Amino acid sequence: MISTAIQQLVNYGLDTGLILPDDEIYIRNQLLMTMQLDDFTAPEGEVCYTDLESILKTLVDDAAARGVCEDNSTARDLFDTKLMGVLTPRPSIVRANFEERYENEGPQAATDWFYKFSQDTDYIRRYRIKRDLKWVTKTPYGDLDITINLSKPEKDPKAIAAAKLAPQSAYPKCQLCAENEGYAGRMNHPARENHRIIPLTINDSAWNLQYSPYVYYNEHCIVFNHLHTPMKLERATFRKLLDFVGLFPHYFVGSNADLPIVGGSILSHDHFQGGHYEFAMAKAPIEKKWVFPGFEDVDAGIVHWPMSCIRLTSEDDSRLVELADKILTAWRGYSDESCFVFAETDGEPHNTITPIARMRDGRYQLDLVLRNNITTPEHPLGVFHPHAKLHHIKKENIGLIEVMGLAVLPSRLKKEMAELADVLVSRTPAAQYPEELQKHAEWAGDILARHPELSADNVHPILQDEIGQVFAEVLADAGVYKLDEAGRAGFVRFLASVQ
């Protein structure tokens, strides 16, 4: 039985091209060593398999039963990654393959290959990504992408307890560091034996390309500084973003803002996120054209989007860098009390930008989304952040991915929405809702008022649409300049101040 599973994994490696026929005996023996087995009985006849997940489950179940690995969710992930690491070619081979395709077939062929490779190695776990719930909601701002993230593993209680007892280590310094490549992992740090990165040079500095293991959208990649250095938004950031889309014109790339609340979850390591996907914000039109003095050659304007976005387009990327830097510098020091925009309070800076770069019809394009992280007693998590009445759906930071129009919502919503559907269909009074649904009660009442036709047949699409509309409100809350007369006038005042 276990010999069959080992041969199935070898055959999987051969079928995907991770290993070559000359490697078969060697790889089989390396897998035996990893499994702490001494014997192998060649299976009779042709060895077939259905999917990678079931092969790995068979092998990990056996290893756990024999005490080779612990039987909790994290230890199992560490061990199956160790098995896949046996099949994964060394970095030098991967990079040579990528570079050969880039030079001979072009950048898209190179990334197509690397993306498939990152899935074949199980670094991107296809079978987990499929669990994510995804849909599209039509809004006045375009079609917003909504996803309930179920692919990021939630640790079971045994794994959480083991992680607390695990010795602390400062290596690698964070989960983005280049030193993760090939790292075996531990109870409080994921295994990366099957992880490979591609070196890049942008703005004459060493960076790397990898994919996100959680793939929130097509070819979701991470571009990160080779050095563990903090996020910093500056003139060089725009140069790096535009250099990247010059290298990979079929990809967009953007940076999270560099301040808490409006930034991403990792501020300690300078990095960007990109991919082969067009978000609603990229499709959104210009609602007001603008000409910046001295930059008449750059097409500019305000984007029709709930967050405050300036779009710049030019054939000359150096002109975009110069103008974007001018806008960033102006915004860092800009205050407008009438719109509750304060550059700083008590010496703490508040203004920053979320920038996104892409190629559009052979021209360079930058979207600059204005951000401000000021807090008040009324809005302790941020004035320009989802307000409390929306926290039942989304209370986390609005980072780069959300800014562009993709909601990454917590996994708890899958269970809560299934339960909410039942109480809506049965017209259960809000006072009788179970405790975990109380936070949705007011919203649920509004849904019933809007949809008296709600029934068991249509409750799920109605709930999906309503969640999407909440996300549109989330984006509006996070927008510095509101989409009303006062907000638009305030936005124009800022643009006019950029000299």
Residue ranges and their predicted role:
Residues E193-I198, H226-V253:
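Helical scaffold of the NTase/Pol beta-like nucleotidyltransferase catalytic core
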Residues Y171, I266-D270, E278, G294-D297, ...:
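Short alpha-helical interface elements
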Residues A236, V245, P249-S265, G274-S335:
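Catalytic or ion-translocation cores adjacent to nucleophile or general acid/base/metal-coordination motifs
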Residues L209, V253, D270-F272:
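Hydrophobic faces of well-ordered beta-strands that scaffold small-molecule active sites
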Residues N218-N225, G263-F279, V369:
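Histidine-centered divalent-metal-coordination microenvironment in nucleic-acid enzymes
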Residues M1-V223, L227-P230, P306, L320-A324, ...:
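Active-site microenvironments that recognize anionic phosphate/pyrophosphate groups
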Residues P260-S268, D346-T352:
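Beta-rich nucleic-acid/ligand-interaction surfaces
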